[in-house]
Amino acid sequence: MALRWGIVSAGLIANDFTTVLSSLPSSEHQVVAVAARDLNRAEEFAQKFNIPKAYGSYEELAKDPNVEVAYIATQHPQHKPAVLLCLAAGKAVLCEKPMGVNAAEVREMVAKARSQGVFLMEAIWSRFFPAMEALREVLVQGTIGDLRVARAEFGFDLSHIPRATDWNQAGGGLLDLGIYCVQFLSMIFGAQKPEKISAVGRIHETGVDDTVSVLLQYPGGVHGSFTCSISSNLPNTAYVSGTKGMAQIQKLWAPTELVVNGERKEFPPPVLGKDYNFVNGSCMLYEANHVRECLRKGLKESPVVPLAESELLAEILEEARKAIGVTFPQDKR
């Protein structure tokens, strides 16, 4: 039976996710509604993807009885109200990353999902790529021995994108790009809470974090580190080293190859749909299918991206951000 999706926002990432859903068998996924704050945008989006309902408010979509799961694709400062709205209406929710601007927002969303008994998941799509699944298998098998250190880097020059440097919209590198790095380290070290978090960084003239390096000390004497930047291009790779070798991931946010002890294995993206805004956009299908599987099993959260880990990721990002002196308007609410 098809999973019935409602798309909240008609932006770029919503376009890519809907392109994927529309390319999958209609017996598995159907997009039944889209909502944007501008009805014209919602109607254009609906026309493009042949979606039966277009709404000019998120409230209308939340009330639509035909919507089974809402995909929240707004900018991250708008995630919390949209998520709470849909959860209150009894909709399952897949929310884009980062789920919230700070840990308090994420905790509030998680608490609401649990009190409502409704499914909620942070859309950390990278975790579902076959290359990342293969890396997890490498760790389980002990191929690289006992873990010692992991590192991730993610940086692009985004200074030409107004949202990236907008303090009111919680711009900056940590929330936009750092989430990919910290989720990688958390995956490697089993979602443990770091014993110590330290950070150094450069603050942009608008007050957002520009380029930040973070060191995470984990139990057992192992550690991870990452650097993210919105003003410079970085290698955008990640690696984990152990007593018997090293595994490397290219394109950390959308990986299609894994190198283990010098042996390279490629995982080509599926040929599905076209005209994506983001690299390897067709790979969103792995995440979509995971949500369907979770809901068909009656799960209230994902075993791959559990809610407690989403809370932890938000705590780490907030602590790192405040360590370099960056606070956002949302922190005062």
Curated annotation (Swiss-Prot):
GO function term, MF aspect, one: nucleotide binding
Catalytic activity: (1R,2R)-1,2-dihydrobenzene-1,2-diol + NADP(+) = catechol + NADPH + H(+); D-xylose + NADP(+) = D-xylono-1,5-lactone + NADPH + H(+)
Protein name as catalogued: Trans-1,2-dihydrobenzene-1,2-diol dehydrogenase
Positions marked as site (May play an important role in coenzyme binding): 71, 79, 97
Keyword Endoplasmic reticulum: no
Record keywords: NADP, Oxidoreductase
PANTHER family named among the record's database cross-references: OXIDOREDUCTASES, TRANS-1,2-DIHYDROBENZENE-1,2-DIOL DEHYDROGENASE
Signal peptide residue numbers: none
InterPro entries in UniProt: Gfo/Idh/MocA-like_OxRdtase_N, Gfo/Idh/MocA_domain, GFO_IDH_MocA-like_dom, NAD(P)-bd_dom_sf
Family as reported in the entry's similarity comment: Belongs to the Gfo/Idh/MocA family.
Pfam families: GFO_IDH_MocA (PF01408), GFO_IDH_MocA_C3 (PF22725)
UniProt EC number: 1.3.1.20, 1.1.1.179
One BP term from GO: D-xylose catabolic process
Domain of life: Eukaryota
Stretches assigned to coiled coil: none
Site (May play an important role in catalytic activity): 180
Subunit structure comment from the entry: Homodimer.
Sites marked May play an important role for the adaptation of the alcohol substrate into the binding site: 176
Gene name, Swiss-Prot/TrEMBL: Dhdh
